[in-house]
Amino acid sequence: MTDLAAIKIVRLDKELPLPKRAHRGDAGVDLHATTDAVIAPGHREIVGTGIAIALPLGTVGLVHPRSGLAAREGLSIVNAPGTIDADYRGEIKVCLINLDPEKPIMITRGDRIAQLVIQKVELVDFEEVEELDDTVRGDQGYGSTGKTA
């Protein structure tokens, strides 16, 4: 028996392993590629993971790049982190990109291509107003915190 919350999962590709953590305290579980792919430098490819999940309302799945692949190969995720909404029930797919300027990246079926992190999320409604409360920062945006008086 485990004290971790259970997420319902459908294995769409029975030959691939279920997502799992490498270590008990890891935030993310590994996602595996359903197909082989060659991603040319600067190009992207949408790759299936062979799973669909049912997230509880008030949670979100975030698909992150794997740090080792990013560092060694230049493999990343175009929209990192990818967002899996609680009401989505289709296959989780990952839009991979090759950031290496010269070398293609080979993806082999079964490779661990991304990590899925499940988080609680605050669901809110928006209230339209004419103006916002004043703050010390105000409307100072990009680069404003690096300025000195």
Swiss-Prot record:
InterPro entries assigned: dUTPase (IPR008181), dUTPase-like (IPR029054), dUTPase-like_sf (IPR036157), dUTPase_trimeric (IPR033704)
Keywords noted in UniProt: Hydrolase, Magnesium, Metal-binding, Nucleotide metabolism
GO molecular function: dUTP diphosphatase activity; magnesium ion binding
Cofactor: Mg(2+)
SUPFAM superfamilies: dUTPase-like
Pathway: Pyrimidine metabolism; dUMP biosynthesis; dUMP from dCTP (dUTP route): step 2/2
BP term (GO), one: dUTP catabolic process
Cited PANTHER family: DEOXYURIDINE 5'-TRIPHOSPHATE NUCLEOTIDOHYDROLASE
NCBIfam families with a match to the protein in the record: dut (TIGR00576), PRK00601.1 (NF001862)
Family according to the record: Belongs to the dUTPase family.
UniProt-recorded name of the protein: Deoxyuridine 5'-triphosphate nucleotidohydrolase
Organism field: Corynebacterium glutamicum (strain ATCC 13032 / DSM 20300 / JCM 1318 / BCRC 11384 / CCUG 27702 / LMG 3730 / NBRC 12168 / NCIMB 10025 / NRRL B-2784 / 534)
